[in-house]
């Protein structure tokens, strides 16, 4: 939407895709630069979008972009200071990209860890029995412990929260406010599947660049299928 587009690179000019061998690829989505589709976006609007989800925030304690500086630089430094205050680690030599950008690695066949230093999301996908029209998606958080041993916490194993088909991701309190993004991302899956099955040729045509990761995975799967069954 327009609000998020103020601070997120939402089109191909603001995203990068990399492929590493047969079993890993990466997506980097730039944060702190507006969508090229929007014109005349002020730096303060960009920073407000990053931290507050809105392009115009009226609050006495909000972070201000100094005259002549870029929101991306200011936001990255604010993140460094916040992380150091939270866990005691030194982030002064970490890049702006590691502080802000959405960096996602896909490791074949079913593992997707986020990179960078914010609290990291991990995705894992597994078969749902023998159903070809269903799968299990797991979302987990990883977070660094405090650098000071005296301040480190003993973490107990977290029980799995299974969502029913009638629940939304946003119903999971464990996702601490980002579940609605999952719900938005998954809202079009039924239409995507119908479109796939409606192909008259029975084949799929991938976009040259933005869907290169999908093509990469299918090429790897084809290589394994061509080898035939594994021999004991």
Where are these regions (language model features)?
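Single conserved hydrophobic/aromatic residue that forms the stacking wall/gate
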Residues: 1-12
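Polyanion-binding catalytic cores of nucleic-acid enzymes and NTP/SAM-utilizing transferases
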Residues: 10-93
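C-terminal active-site-capping segments
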Residues: 196-232
């Amino acid at each position: 939407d327009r609000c998020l587009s103020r601070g997120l690179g939402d089109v191909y000019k603001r995203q990068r895709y990399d492929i590493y061998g047969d079993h890993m690829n990466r997506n980097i989505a730039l944060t702190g630069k507006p969508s090229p589709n929007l014109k005349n976006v002020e730096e303060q609007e960009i920073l407000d979008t990053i931290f507050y989800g809105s392009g115009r925030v009226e609050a006495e304690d909000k972070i201000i972009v100094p005259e002549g500086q870029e929101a991306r630089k200011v936001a990255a430094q604010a993140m460094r200071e916040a992380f150091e205050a939270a866990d005691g680690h030194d982030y002064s030599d970490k890049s702006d990209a590691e502080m802000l950008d959405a960096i996602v690695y896909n490791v074949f066949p079913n593992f997707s860890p986020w990179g960078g230093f914010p609290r990291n999301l991990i995705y894992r996908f597994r078969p749902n029995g023998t159903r070809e029209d269903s799968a299990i998606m797991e979302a987990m958080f990883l977070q660094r412990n405090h650098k000071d041993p005296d301040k480190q916490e003993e973490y107990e194993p977290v029980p799995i929260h299974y969502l029913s088909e009638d629940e939304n991701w946003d119903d999971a309190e464990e996702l601490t406010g980002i579940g609605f993004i999952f719900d938005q991302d998954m809202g079009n899956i039924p239409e995507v599947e119908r479109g796939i099955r409606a192909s008259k040729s029975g084949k799929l045509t991938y976009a040259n660049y933005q869907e290169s990761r999908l093509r990469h995975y299918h090429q790897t799967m084809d290589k394994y299928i061509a080898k035939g069954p594994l021999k004991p």
